[in-house]
């Protein structure tokens, strides 16, 4: 499962780079480029500020394990990094095959293993760090599941001619509720 995920990730790298470049370019544009209604996505600034907000929430929520804010900020950064890649894999697989083949468990295990490797490499060993690794894995599990559902929603919206921006706003409201 992990090997298939990494192969999918490698195949997705050109798409990831292209989308990231397009998002960064759209942030710097002064005049709005005329897009058709069905290509109007949520502003890339929302993604950036949402990611920063997630890291800030993780740093200050008392439910997140960690002895100080530094550890919690590292957890937030790991969630952003792993989420960036594993959400891409989840979305791609669900878009190509369907939601029944979303490899959430494999990506969660790979995330926990990678987080454990990061922790070991910086000397964070012991029982106090185990819940921290599980938090990162749990958040990636949730992100991958939401990515699959979002991918299905956007695919259906594309087929019926919906505006992606409004779908994305509705999905944000659903997450908050």
What are these regions (language model features)?
Residues 1-177:
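Alpha-helical multipass membrane-protein architecture
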């Amino acid at each position: 499962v992990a090997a298939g995920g990494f192969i999918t990730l490698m195949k997705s790298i050109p798409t990831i780079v292209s989308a990231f470049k397009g998002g960064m370019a759209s942030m710097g544009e002064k005049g709005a480029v005329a897009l058709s209604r069905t290509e109007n996505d949520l502003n890339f600034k929302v993604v950036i500020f949402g990611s920063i907000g997630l890291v800030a929430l993780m740093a200050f929520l008392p439910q997140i394990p960690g002895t100080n804010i530094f550890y919690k900020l590292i957890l937030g950064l790991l969630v952003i990094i792993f989420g960036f890649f594993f959400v891409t894999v989840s979305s791609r697989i669900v878009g190509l095959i369907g939601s029944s083949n979303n490899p959430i468990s494999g990506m969660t295990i790979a995330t926990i293993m990678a987080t454990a490797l990061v922790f070991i490499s910086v000397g964070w060993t012991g029982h106090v760090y185990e819940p921290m690794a599980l938090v990162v894995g749990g958040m990636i599990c949730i992100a991958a599941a939401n990515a699959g559902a979002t991918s299905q929603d956007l695919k259906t919206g594309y087929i019926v001619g919906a505006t992606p921006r409004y779908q994305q706003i509705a999905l944000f409201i659903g997450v908050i509720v």
